[in-house]
A protein has these predicted regions:
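Non-catalytic all-alpha helical scaffold/repeat segments
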Residues: 1-504
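Short, charged, amphipathic alpha-helical segments
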Residues: 539-549
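Amphipathic alpha-helical coiled-coil segments
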Residues: 550-564
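Short amphipathic alpha-helical heptad-repeat segments
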Residues: 514-526
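Short, charged/polar, low-complexity loop and linker segments
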Residues: 526-532
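Non-globular sequence segments
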Residues: 494-507, 512-513, 562-565
Length: 565
């Protein structure tokens, strides 16, 4: 054990020798130094303090703030197994104070650390009883920041320089800290100008203005004009304008901006803020503006947000116009908004043949974003009439006797096939019911369409796939009576094969259990077939075959399980 410890110590010394004035290397050393005994720590810390004197202030403060954070972390999680003793932490604190920066402003930068890991030297430990530990530490953070800023002002240090360094070091809440603690929630033109000058990206400026604007004590229009006079940052300008809660479209800040700003504004993936007191015409104006300047996603997001503020007819009209938007940017939430809008429109217009057809066309347009079960109007159209389904067949499959492949048709078929394969429905089904007359009419028309397309050989295979999605019959067995009659009338080997395959595929993912579940399915399908065999022999034959398939599969799974043992 002694030899192993000696190796660790020598390795640490080797790392220290190679660290020189590299802050990153010293930070890595600090992460493991607590594992060594006191004399070794003292030796390493003394070397660290010496090397820090040779560093520039930027490097010094990185090391110093790392030590500060380790003190905070260990005192906060005081009961954790990996925690340092208070004796070691006091040593850390002592050594931290020995690291002196030439420009004292650097010592104030830690006040811009995030709320959730603000490096208090003496936080309330997480082990304390009570649920308000976070709130109490937040209060301590506020006191710390206020005290440090008071000291900063008393010593006459430059606020402009503090802002410059904080932005340079990429602290993320600079604007918020200045607004809340330095300006006490009030607008300070000098601070704003300094933030604009030092932060080219504009995030700190936005955070500063946003915090004060939320308190309602800033003239946003005046600030926007001031930013325009100082900066050419259009992104910052757009973000600031986005803070406005609009209640009057004529006087809205965005209304008077140029085309570029409007495009950036309406393409932002943030919810438009319209006052609850705004008149109906404000929402109508916003729809037009978003349609003209926004993206596919932001337009959908906006329609979703105001769906309760406009009539269903207006929502319907606005949704139909989405196909005119050229900016087709989408994100992970686009399908959520789309589904929410369609849920409303489908509920109101699914019985209106004209509007249902238009919505079905739009559902087809969005087929890459909507799941089949969400395309209720398209389902109704295809269940009521086979024309569209047949047209898809003509795109995907070759004509009888045709070997030539048209390249344009092949590319179109590739785009359509995956969706076509998801279209699972029973023709003419409505609310779980199917009538023989309607189903036969659909089947006959579909066969005639296939014949006219020179694809009649596909009839049995396609019909078998669709009929497998029949609802349950009045007697509690599958398929329903109307489908049984159609199977008896149009039965072919291809219909049987496709029906069996589709029915088995409906099972989906399942747990392997040595054939037990397959045996249960075998019995269930056998019982179903026995009930049908006298009156519907062809239909029963289909279910007997499914039963036999599961019986074979059950034996196979049982054998596999036994072989594993």
């Amino acid at each position: 054990m002694y030899e192993i410890n000696k190796i660790y110590i020598e390795y640490l010394r080797m790392c220290v020798d190679k660290a020189h004035t590299d802050a990153d290397r010293w930070i890595k050393i600090l992460q493991c130094i607590n594992r060594y005994e006191g004399s070794i720590r003292k030796e390493i810390f003394e070397e660290l303090v010496i090397k820090c004197k040779e560093m520039n202030d930027e490097e010094k403060i990185r090391v110093k703030n790392k030590i500060r954070y380790e003190i905070f972390r260990n005192r906060y999680f005081v009961d954790e197994d990996w925690g340092m003793s208070e004796e070691i932490l006091c040593e850390y604190e002592c050594r931290m104070n020995e690291i002196i920066v030439d420009e004292k402003i650097y010592d104030f930068l830690y006040i811009f650390s995030h709320k959730y890991d603000f490096p208090l030297l003496n936080p309330i430990p997480n082990s304390k009883e009570g649920t308000d530990i976070h709130d109490k530490n937040y209060i301590l953070r506020e006191k710390e920041i206020k005290a440090r800023l008071k000291e900063f002002n008393e010593k006459g240090y430059s606020i402009d320089r503090l802002i410059q360094l904080a932005v340079q070091e990429k602290y993320e809440i600079v604007g918020e800290v200045f607004a809340q603690f330095y300006c006490n929630g009030s607008f300070n033109e000098k601070v704003l100008c300094s933030l604009i000058k030092n932060d080219e990206e504009g995030k700190s400026v936005y955070d500063y203005v946003s915090y004060i604007y939320r308190n309602g004590i800033i003239d946003l229009r005046k600030v926007v004009e001031q930013v325009k006079s100082i900066s050419e940052n259009k992104n910052l300008l757009t973000n600031l304008i986005s803070l406005e809660i609009i209640d009057d479209c004529e006087n809205a800040l965005i209304a008077s901006e140029d085309e570029d700003i409007k495009k950036m504004y309406w393409s932002k993936s943030v919810r438009l803020k319209i006052s609850d007191k705004a008149e109906h015409r404000v929402f109508v104006w916003a729809i037009r503006e978003c349609q003209k300047y926004g993206s596919f996603h932001t337009y959908l997001e906006f329609l979703y947000e105001i769906k309760d503020k406009i009539s269903v007819q207006e929502l319907y009209k606005a949704t139909l116009e989405i196909s005119d938007i050229k900016n087709n940017v989408v994100n992970s939430m686009t399908d959520y908004y789309l589904k929410g809008i369609f849920d409303i429109l489908q509920k109101y217009f699914i019985e209106d043949d004209k509007k249902c057809t238009e919505l079905a066309t739009l559902e087809w347009f969005f087929r890459e974003l909507l799941e089949w079960e969400n395309m209720k109007c398209m389902q109704k159209i295809m269940k009521d009439d086979p024309t569209f389904y047949a047209s898809l067949v003509s795109i995907i499959y070759k004509m009888d006797g045709c070997e030539a492949v048209d390249e344009a048709k092949r590319k179109l078929a590739d785009k359509v096939y995956s969706w076509f394969n998801e279209a699972k429905f029973c023709p003419t089904e409505k609310n779980g019911k199917v009538t023989y007359e309607n189903l036969k009419r659909w089947i006959e028309k579909f066969r005639n369409l296939l014949t006219s397309q020179k694809q009649e050989k596909l009839f049995g295979n396609l019909i078998g796939c669709l009929l497998a999605y029949s609802p349950i019959g009045e007697d509690g067995y599958s398929p329903c009576e109307a489908v049984r009659m159609i199977i008896e009338e149009y039965y072919t080997d291809s219909l049987k094969t496709s029906y069996v395959m589709e029915e088995e595929n409906k099972r989906g993912i399942h747990i392997v259990d040595a054939g037990k579940s397959e045996l249960i399915l075998c019995q269930r399908y056998k019982e179903n077939a026995e009930v049908l065999q006298e009156q519907y022999p062809y239909t029963a034959e289909i279910y007997f075959e499914i039963s036999d398939n599961y019986k074979c599969e059950s034996k196979y799974e049982r054998k596999c399980a036994e072989d594993e043992w």
